Amino acid sequence: MKKEKILKQIDKLKSIAIAEGIDLSSEINRLRGLLELESDDYKKEKEIEEVFSIVQNSRKVERPKPQDFIKALIKDFIELKGDRRFANDEAVIGGIGYFDKYPVTAVGIQKGHTLNENITFNFGSPHPEGYRKALRLAFQAEKFSRPILFFVDTPGAYPGIDSEERGMAQAIAENLYYLSDLKTPIISIITGEGGSGGALALGVSDILIMMQNAILSVISPEGCASILFKDSSKAAQAAVSLKLTSFDLLSLGIVDKVIDEGPGLDIDPQIGYKNLADQISTSLAYFSSLNQKELVEHRYQKLRKIGFYKDTTGFVKKGLNKSKNFIYELFKF
């Protein structure tokens, strides 16, 4: 029942109650309850619409991709290829250059703006050699004390048989393991999609930054809807449940900073570039001032806090002591 129709019925019942002197309060209250439900449904529909529009925005081909961010922010960039074990993965671009006065290593999971580019970049889904390339460059950055900038835009790691045969799970796990203890500043930026372990492999950092209209999730809304609702067409509802927007993740303490895009990266990327550059400058100045021990400890504490809810150790010990005392009193002779 529509909101306007319910309001008209309430007004009509009020008029009848006054004119006839009849108590219609129970029926009026019932309609008011329906009105509240209608308002809640409207709010839910609005939220679903807004969240899914962010998901669609994050996937737009017009949005700058990681290679565009590198081109805009990194001077004198020199690309370095290959993982030195199997092959060069075109889905991952990496190399060295300058951000302002800082020599940096920049690595990005890149997507294309055209069909041919997306075929070359495997639609932004890296193979194991892509993650091993990123880790090789990270070790090199540590050796030469260069900060690392990770730019992430991926629906997830490539799930094909060839990826499994070459050790995808191990490649991602090794990134998580070694990056958590790397003794050089790491800044990760989610520029578009941040899909599952494929994004997490470049997300271990001293500060995790998201562009305003980017998303980060353990699974795509379509995949989640297929599993939970058995219907991929309910992706919009799943997107709300996943809490995948930058502001959701900021409130949960998973993301550290959200970058204002202005009118949108697909409309005018320069505003987003400038705001991101300002944040990177601030972060590099701070993390470069820490010694290696302080840097790794900061990263450790940051990662440990994610998902932390409440320490119940004290309550458990107190409860155990009470139980022991009760049993002692019960059975003493």
Q: PLM features: what roles do these ranges have?
A:
Residues V92, Y131, L135-A138, A236, ...:
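Hydrophobic alpha-helical segments
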Residues M1-P103, K111, F123, K274-F333:
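Intrinsically disordered, low-complexity segments enriched in small/flexible residues
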Residues Y98-S180, P185-T191, S196:
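Cleft-lining beta-strand/loop regions that shape enzyme active-site pockets
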Residues K2, V152-S281, A285, S289:
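Conserved catalytic cores of soluble enzyme domains
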Residues I6, E50, A106, D153, ...:
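Terminal peptide-recognition signature
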Residues E27, L31, G130-Y131, C224:
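Short, motif-level signal for alpha-helix interfacial/capping segments enriched in acidic residues
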